Amino acid sequence: MQWGVPFTVSIEPTTACNLRCPECPSGLRAFTRDTGNLKEDFFKKMLSELGDKLMYLIFYFQGEPFINPNFLKMVSYANKKGIYTITSTNGHFLNDTNAKETIESGLDRIIISVDGTTQEVYESYRKEGDLEKVI
C-alpha cells in the first residue's frame, strides 16, 4: 500500500482545441479557469516532485494534446522515467511525420476519438471535424 504520493496523474497538455464539440468547455470556448499550454519546465518540476512513485500518466483532459508544441517532448521525458503514458486525441493533427514522432516518443497508448461512421453523424459530435482526415 502506498501513502502520500499519487501513482496515477492526469494532466492537461493544453486547453486549446481545433474542434467545437458541443459538450466540451474547450470546444465551446467556455472555460471558467485559466487556459493555455502546459509549460515543459513546470511539467518536469511536477515529475521531479512526484519522484519515482508515479507509474501512470494520462496526458488528456479537455483540449487537443497535439496543439501543445512540447507535448511529445513531455511524453518522451516521462517515458525515460519509466512512466506508462496515455493520451486521447481527435486525430486531426496526426500525419506521417508526427505519427513517427509519436511512436519514437514512447507513448504507450493513444485513443483516437471517432464519434460516428458518416460525416453527418461525426460532425454532430465533433463540430468542424473531418471524418475522412481522421480515418
Question: What are these model-derived regions, one by one?
Answer:
Residues 1-109, 120, 124-125, 129-132:
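Conserved alpha-helical substructure of the radical SAM core
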Residues 112-114:
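Conserved phosphate-donor/acceptor-positioning beta-strand/loop module used by diverse small-molecule
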Residues 117:
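Flexible loop/hinge segments that line or gate small-molecule binding clefts
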Residues 135:
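Conserved active-site region of classical short-chain dehydrogenase/reductase
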